[in-house]
Amino acid sequence: MTRDDKFPIVYSLLLIVLLFVSPIYGDGDADALLKFKSSLVNASSLGGWDSGEPPCSGDKGSDSKWKGVMCSNGSVFALRLENMSLSGELDVQALGSIRGLKSISFMRNHFEGKIPRGIDGLVSLAHLYLAHNQFTGEIDGDLFSGMKALLKVHLEGNRFSGEIPESLGKLPKLTELNLEDNMFTGKIPAFKQKNLVTVNVANNQLEGRIPLTLGLMNITFFSGNKGLCGAPLLPCRYTRPPFFTVFLLALTILAVVVLITVFLSVCILSRRQGKGQDQIQNHGVGHFHGQVYGQPEQQQHSEKSSQDSKVYRKLANETVQRDSTATSGAISVGGLSPDEDKRGDQRKLHFVRNDQERFTLQDMLRASAEVLGSGGFGSSYKAALSSGRAVVVKRFRFMSNIGREEFYDHMKKIGRLSHPNLLPLIAFYYRKEEKLLVTNYISNGSLANLLHANRTPGQVVLDWPIRLKIVRGVTRGLAYLYRVFPDLNLPHGHLKSSNVLLDPNFEPLLTDYALVPVVNRDQSQQFMVAYKAPEFTQQDRTSRRSDVWSLGILILEILTGKFPANYLRQGKGADDELAAWVESVARTEWTADVFDKEMKAGKEHEAQMLKLLKIGLRCCDWDIEKRIELHEAVDRIEEVDRDAGGGQESVRSSYVTASDGDHRSSRAMTEEFSLM
């Protein structure tokens, strides 16, 4: 047999192997799940698990008839068994053989006993949700040592005791840790993760000093622990030993005696000096003091500012000390080149627009400040200037992805943007370690706040016409970004309800747009919304349709009134788990009940609302090839707006797809479509 004759045989054998291997993996997942089910009590609620069908089915292996099982590319990636009245002692050892398992949630059941056996064997797990059960006992300090992929751990609402496992503080990717409402004792271990956003230990029995790395977190995360102290709680008291107290008192008395002696000596010497020389010296000292250390009225202004935050004061003090030699006129205009006086240039507030009131960095830092929010990138403050104007200062910590000149160029490019649905950038401040971006303050606040915050008397309700107006404006602003940034894969990159502000007429204004090029890659992938799209979580890539995915999530949020992050504590939240949230909307019976009741829309609007719901679902289709492109979403939303009696103007004429420059008319895009 010749060498050429052997090739068909080899290929045939390979084909046979592939045909057999594929179902083996599927059967392996099924066997593991059935073995796990056999260890549960009251498992009758697990519908479809005994159907004889594989857990993952469909053309691309992304569908599952097994209740609570989520699949991707033919393998199980998440197990979500919540509110099913399951009980007994949980044993997850059988799940260790499911290679692609990234997330498990057993929240709000009746499991008891110690932390599930075999949990440390799930080394690929990224999300662990065991909250609101009846687990008890101590957790071994090294339990999580081998689970390096963990991003989110939710153990709240149980009766765990003993010390918080030190291995949690050593998980390199950890961003979220919820341990509230347990019985943990001892001290909080050290947490040094750079991307850590939440460590909630409220309502335990912890004591000692809060680690410095957690000092900027929300104060409520540490409430209900009588023994805790340190930022953000009250300072810790230090009880000195008696000997140290006596020694300190003696040292103080000695210092006072020395100071009195020095003072008397200076007085005697000063009287012997000439009057003219004395005047010259006094004038020189006073002039120097005024230049370097500032004016008394500045100190009074700072002391009177009741809203000023400690973090903002720290930033102001650091900057004032660094910039103490800068003059009050050190202010830059948009045309300044980054090559001009690079050292002095870093002390300036650079304005990128010529239609805004000018103020200096010192003016801004002297203003009374109010903390608006804090997130993965940094913090936001409202600064009330002495002129009466209010601005928002956003302090970013992870903007070193490009060099100084490229940063200047990109900020000036953003400053030149002009669209009714974009909040314009006013100015920026550059330092290598941190950046400040300044925008106007919008009193109505964010869409997220109006959708989800507790209702206050007299607050405007977002009815159907307003919500449609918001969707239309958001889409138009996004289409404009797509047109002016044809080379950016993610023209917005961080589209979410908290980044949509509403002006007095409830016209939406997009914020935090076009920042992907300047944000560090690790942080952008960790925190920016576009990187939660399934094509990135599964294939490590983004596309021009990733922002469309974010738009779809936003449309569903606006229509249902449900905040995706609320599902985080129920195992339905960020990252790949948004699939379950979207799926829950898609599978809900499409009646008026799916919509937020606060919209108060009549039956005459139901057809338009359902049409917009379909558009939202098409925008966030899990399959990127089936997901509609932005130009199609624009056309469909404009059609809904026209059907509802909205404005006749369209943004289609100004939008061009980046891939093919397609100029298809709106009419060609308005045919009825089917989702299922």
UniProtKB/Swiss-Prot annotation:
PROSITE patterns: PROTEIN_KINASE_DOM. Its main location: membrane. ATP binds at residues 372-380, 394. Residues 27-242 are extracellular. Residues 319-330 have a biased composition (Polar residues). Residues 319-347, 641-676 are annotated as: Disordered. The lineage of its organism: Eukaryota, Viridiplantae, Streptophyta, Embryophyta, Tracheophyta. It comes from the Eukaryota. This is Probable LRR receptor-like serine/threonine-protein kinase At4g31250. GO terms for molecular function: ATP binding; protein serine kinase activity; protein serine/threonine kinase activity. It comes from Arabidopsis thaliana (Mouse-ear cress). It is a single-pass type I membrane protein. GO terms for cellular component: membrane. LRR repeats lie at residues 98-122, 123-146, 148-171, 172-195, 197-218. The chain crosses the membrane at residues 243-263.
